[in-house]
Regions:
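Acidic/aromatic-lined carbohydrate-recognition and catalytic surfaces
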Residues: 1-95, 99, 111-174
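Hydrophobic residues within beta-strands of alpha/beta enzymes
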Residues: 105-107
Length: 185
């Protein structure tokens, strides 16, 4: 029997020690491990990014006065892979489980791990049918960004440190984009 576990590198729980530390103050060393932004001039979310489950992808943290990003539920804040400390920490999580004997990972929402550095609004979707609000915008600044393949390559390098292990990513993209995620191994 082989054991494959779900790895969720895009976000953590809001109860995870990393996020609790990040949330504790703007000066905390782990603050940059998550995506925090000041409010827009009107006090609202920093941009128009939407949650997959409805509404804005941002929640205001009253204590710090900044918003944190969550493309799913508010209890799943997004890690900031532009922070140089985050990827090595996640690679250590992978090694922890591989050392325990798991045979590989199904990597959740792997194509969402990087976000636009400038936090630009996603443009309106001209083909939106008015049904699913999440589809009202084209997610050009929130998914499948340049650089995500390098993150995946570094994750694959960890897998290659072990014999007979595997990794597969959950990716919902058009076929022409999806093919760019197929590796040689």
């Amino acid at each position: 029997m082989r054991i494959i576990i779900d790895l969720v590198p895009n976000h953590t729980s809001d109860e995870h020690p990393w996020f609790i530390e990040s949330r504790s103050s703007r000066e905390d060393p782990k603050r940059d491990w998550y995506i925090w932004r000041d409010p827009a001039p009107d006090g609202g979310p920093p941009n128009n990014w939407l949650s997959y489950f409805g509404g804005p992808a941002w929640t205001l943290d009253e204590a710090s006065g900044q918003y944190y990003l969550h493309q799913f539920v508010t209890q799943q804040p997004e890690l900031n892979y532009r922070c140089p400390e985050v990827l090595p920490a996640m690679l250590e999580v992978m090694r922890f489980w591989l050392d325990k004997g798991v045979d590989g990972f199904r990597v959740d929402v792997i194509w969402l791990m990087l976000k636009d550095e400038q936090f630009r609004d996603n443009p309106p979707n001209p083909d939106w049918d008015g049904v699913d609000p999440k589809r009202s915008l084209l997610p050009v600044h929130t998914q499948n960004l340049p650089g995500v393949h390098e993150l995946i390559k570094q994750m694959r390098n960890v897998i290659d440190e072990y014999d007979d292990r595997m990794m597969v990513g959950e990716i919902y993209l058009p076929n022409e984009d999806l093919m760019n995620y197929c590796g040689e191994k």
